[in-house]
From Swiss-Prot:
Residues 55-68 are annotated as: Loop 1. It comes from Drosophila pseudoobscura pseudoobscura. Residues 128-159 form a propeptide. This is UPAR/Ly6 domain-containing protein qvr. Belongs to the quiver family. The gene is qvr.
């Protein structure tokens, strides 16, 4: 009896997880494509000259006490560089960069020296975040964990 219930629960969890996984795989690339086709707002600042640009970003500050926003036809960018004992943060739009890369949303690239990184995102004011992971990627991680747990439960209940 327990084995039959275990199989039913494991199969049910696996089916639900597969459905969410499929939806997520369709949803995330569509969100990434939006970065290239619509205008978004990005913070534009440099912590070297504007203390409001530093991490952690003050989300509770009034708009006038936050760094300026700019309209962006691309992705928002956050660059972090460690110079001597100081962390320098720069927030901007990809249209200001002189690079020709295929832009992939919610990706961070480490500097070859290991002294900094550059992250890209495609939601309004997303470059204010300390880590530029979107809810979609958090959802994808949760789904991956759920698949692993449901498989493990199925294995344990089938013994």
């Amino acid at each position: 009896m327990w084995k039959e219930k275990g199989n039913a629960i494991g199969n049910w969890l696996l089916a639900i997880t597969a459905i969410f996984g499929f939806i997520t795989l369709i949803w995330i690339p569509q969100a990434s494509a939006e970065c290239q086709t619509r205008s978004i707002y990005c913070y534009e600042c440099d912590s070297w000259t504007d203390a409001r640009c530093k991490d952690p970003f003050n989300y509770t500050a009034l708009p006038r006490d936050q760094p300026p926003l700019m309209t962006c036809n691309g992705c928002c960018v956050k660059m972090v560089r460690h110079q001597r004992s100081r962390e320098v943060v720069r927030r901007m739009c990809t249209s200001q960069l002189q690079i020709n890369l295929f832009m992939v949303d919610h990706v961070c690239m480490m500097e070859s020296s290991g002294n900094g990184h550059m992250c890209f995102c495609e939601e309004d004011m997303c470059n204010s975040s300390k880590d530029l992971y979107s809810h979609g990627h958090q959802l994808h991680l949760i789904i991956t964990i759920a698949v692993a747990v449901s498989w493990l439960m199925g294995q344990l209940l089938n013994r």
